């Protein structure tokens, strides 16, 4: 919190954007608002806000926690699908972004892919291994898809004790597939998708998502 206050003091920014800023106290944002009248504060929120989805109450609490100090909130779910957002606060939809410095592949130009369809899931962001005994309905869907399409070559991770992959290993894996499946946890909600969709589409894979 002291580092943030010192940074604002040194640079006098016009805009402060935060996301997953659990370590930043409300009192810090209040201080900045009081002492830098031209400072605008915005929140970027990319986690699921699905009632029957993963971590709903935790994510709901997190997005609301510092909203009293924000001038705008950018959310990867359509705000009109969320009935708990304060009406007086500016909340706007923002899709998960892609950037050519991260999404470096152009798989639509690759005529030598050894696999047809890529899919990966994990039990937590950058969690190296699967949790024992954890059930994920997406695995059922993908396994059924494999059964229905015996002539399709699937490259699957996070399913049937095949561990998740990250970073360079992830890029190398998707570089060998023509298509990708993007499945979000929980029931569909307007505009929301796992940010995996940007990694697949941004790297040039033909990408399949929920119909809803």
Label each residue range with its predicted role.
Residues 5-16, 26-41, 87:
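Glycosyltransferases and closely related glycan-assembly transferases
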Residues 42-56:
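A short, histidine- and acid-enriched strand-loop-helix "catalytic/donor-clamping" loop
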Residues 1-3, 11, 20, 26-27, ...:
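Nucleotide-sugar donor-binding catalytic core of glycosyltransferases
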Residues 17-21, 52:
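Short secondary-structure transition/capping motifs
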Residues 22-23, 47:
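Short, glycine/charge-rich beta-strand/loop segments that flank catalytic centers
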């Amino acid at each position: 919190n002291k580092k943030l206050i010192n940074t604002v003091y040194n640079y006098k920014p016009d805009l402060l954007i935060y996301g997953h800023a659990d370590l930043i106290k409300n009192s810090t944002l209040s201080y900045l608002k009081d002492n830098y009248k031209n400072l605008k504060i915005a929140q970027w929120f990319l986690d699921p806000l699905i009632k029957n989805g993963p971590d709903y109450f935790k994510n709901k609490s997190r997005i609301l926690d510092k909203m009293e100090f924000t001038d705008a909130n950018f959310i990867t779910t359509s705000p009109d699908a969320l009935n708990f957002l304060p009406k007086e606060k500016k909340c706007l939809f923002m899709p998960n972004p892609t950037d050519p410095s991260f999404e470096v592949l152009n798989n639509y130009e690759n005529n030598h892919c050894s696999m047809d369809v890529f899919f990966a899931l994990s039990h937590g962001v950058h969690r190296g291994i699967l949790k024992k005994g954890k059930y994920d309905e997406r695995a059922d869907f993908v396994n059924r898809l494999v059964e229905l399409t015996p002539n399709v070559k699937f490259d699957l991770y996070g399913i049937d004790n095949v561990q998740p992959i990250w970073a360079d290993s992830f890029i190398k894996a998707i570089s060998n597939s023509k298509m990708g499946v993007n499945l979000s946890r929980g029931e569909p909600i307007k505009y929301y998708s796992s940010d995996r969709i940007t990694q697949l589409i941004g790297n040039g894979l033909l990408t399949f998502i929920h119909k809803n």
